[in-house]
Structures are given as C-alpha cells and as structure tokens.
C-alpha cells in the first residue's frame, strides 16, 4: 500500500495521489487477488466509493521464472490463482449488476507469453522458465472469449489485450526485460491505458470477444497513426486469430 512496503518502486498511495492530482477520482484497496474474500472486498469497497461497477480491468498478475522440473506446486497454484482464478471471481462478482443494467465491460490484460513456441524440433531449447505464465495467460484468453459469448445477450463487452511491446515498469526492469523505465525499446504505459479505454467504450459488436494487442487495436480504430510490435509485425496468439 505504501512506498517501501515492497522491494519494487511504487505504491497504491502514490498511484491514487497521481490520479486525484490529475483531476480523476481513485481509492486504493490492498488485497490478495488469489483469495475470494479479498476479491469480494475489492468490489464492495469500489461500489461503496463510486456505485456499481461499469468497467472491470483484470490487470493483476504474478510470475516466477522457474523451469517446470523445479517449480514448487504451491507457487504454481498461487500464480494460477492470481492470473486466472482472480479474473473469474471478480468477473462473477460484477456481472449481476451489469446484467441487470444490460451494459458494462470486462477487459482482461494478457501477455505475449501466451504465444507458444509451436511444435518441435527446437533450435533454441534454452530453458527460460516461462511455461506457467504463458499457460495462465493462454487460459485467460480462452476465458475471455468464452465469457464474451455467455454475456453477449446481456449487452456486456468482454475483451482481452496484451502490450505490443514490453512496458517499462519496476517489475519488468527487475526481471531485466527492459533496461530501465526510459528504455526506448519499451511501450509507453499510456498506450496500454488507451487500449483498455478503447475496448471498454467502443460498440459491443466491434470489440467483444477480441483477443488483441495494444498498438494493433489502437491503429485499427484510428486512435494512433503508427504501430509496431506483436499483432502488427509479429503474429499474435492463436486466440487472437479467431
């Protein structure tokens, strides 16, 4: 919640202050998304502060870079609980109000890790330890399209997107995916925010069930002029092709 509570830079308090200072309204709830009771508390506190939930962004994720042969079962289960079960629980919690209003949007954040290596033989067989994260994000993409079909009749959008390029954050810097927060190879966080807004606000029939990539979808709808990265220069996951 506070700066210094975690080894990574940043805090919920800082984020809330930045939103409020820029003219928005925000409140922070420290919660463990792998726990159902905590998920329900997040929704109840959001409703108490702002009313019924119109848009749910499932952005929380957990990753450990460990080869399967060495992966502790407890960590595997915890990561899936955050990456897959959390979005299910939160979506289930907000759906009754959305169904009653016949409107709403659920946007899930996936990752290029959902793109598998394909079948062998493998010229590059270096162990990177990304099996769990990729599997959980692939599950989230399948969950997205299945839920989109279920709630389509109620006028609710469900969509999913990944960053087209690695977004510099304290976490991606820590894992050496980018060299720093100002790494020019990275994707500005603002593009992720715009893509989430696009999927939550464009007409249902144009976006629901989409599994896409930030710059791909922004360029498709004319929100940006130039695009690069996954979904543009490189083929996305299987679910993004259907």
Give the location of each predicted region.
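Substrate-binding pocket helix/loop in short-chain dehydrogenase/reductase
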Residues: 19, 67-68, 75-77
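Active-site loop of short-chain dehydrogenase/reductase
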Residues: 23-25, 52-53, 98-112, 153-157, ...
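Conserved NAD(P)H cofactor-binding loop of Rossmann-fold oxidoreductase domains
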Residues: 59-64
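C-terminal helical subdomain
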Residues: 153, 160-161, 179-242
């Amino acid at each position: 919640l506070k700066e210094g509570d975690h080894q990574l830079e940043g805090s919920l308090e800082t984020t809330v202050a930045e939103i409020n200072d820029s003219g928005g309204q925000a409140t922070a709830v420290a919660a463990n998304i792998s726990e159902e009771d905590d998920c329900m508390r997040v929704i109840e506190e959001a409703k108490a502060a702002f009313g019924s939930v119109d848009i749910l962004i499932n952005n929380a994720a957990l990753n450990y870079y460990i080869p399967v042969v060495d992966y502790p079962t407890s960590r595997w289960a915890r990561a899936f609980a955050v990456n897959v079960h959390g979005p299910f629980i939160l979506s289930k919690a907000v759906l009754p109000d959305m169904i009653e209003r016949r409107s709403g949007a659920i946007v899930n954040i996936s990752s290029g890790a959902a793109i598998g290596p394909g079948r062998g033989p493998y010229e590059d067989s270096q162990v990177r330890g990304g099996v769990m994260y990729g599997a959980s994000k692939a599950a989230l993409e399948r969950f997205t399209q299945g839920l989109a079909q279920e709630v389509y009749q109620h006028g609710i959008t469900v969509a999913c997107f990944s960053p087209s390029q690695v977004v510099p954050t304290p976490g991606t810097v820590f894992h050496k995916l980018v060299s720093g927060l100002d790494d020019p190879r990275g994707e500005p966080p603002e593009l992720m925010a715009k893509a989430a807004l696009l999927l939550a606000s464009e007409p249902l029939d144009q976006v629901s069930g989409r599994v896409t990539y930030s710059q791909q979808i922004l360029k498709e709808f004319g929100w940006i002029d130039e695009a690069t990265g996954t979904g543009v220069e490189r083929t996305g996951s299987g679910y993004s092709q259907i």
